[in-house]
Amino acid sequence: MEIIKTNFANFVVMDVNLNKLKYTSKGKQKLSYNSNTPRKDNLTFKNPGYLKECIEKGTNKIMASYEQNYEYDILIPPIWEHEYKKDDFQEDHIHYTDHFSFVIYVKGVSGTVFKNPCGYHLQSMYPKFNNYL
């Protein structure tokens, strides 16, 4: 497990056992989304204990990187999935109600870009910012 520190957030990168993270999806749904596609929070993990263990380890590492050493409970909200084909993408977005978020890459490579969510706040205050932030 490694910690990556940036100017706006710290990230944890860790290997997980994908065989222990098997899940099922209820109902038919599109696996590739954009902002106009209704998303269903419908994943059920076959081993939720392992998922929580991974999240706890990552959260503990993040909290330690900020020198935060206090007790907390971890609540895992409904989880959704994206499956991308060539040239698919997810528009940029924020998880404004969550303290932490995670991504599990099942196979392949990713062009994931993390942006400072403060930019959305600045855009709301200065909407005519000429695309520079």
Region locations from a protein language model:
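Non-heme Fe(II)/2-oxoglutarate
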Residues: M1-Y72, D87-F89
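Residues at beta-strand starts and edge strands
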Residues: F8-N10, L75-P77, D98-F100
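Intrinsic-disorder/low-complexity coil detector
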Residues: T37, N47, I76-P77, N116, ...
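A short coil-to-beta-strand element that immediately follows conserved catalytic motifs
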Residues: Q68-I79, F114
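Catalytic core of non-heme Fe(II) oxygenases with the double-stranded beta-helix
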Residues: E81-L133
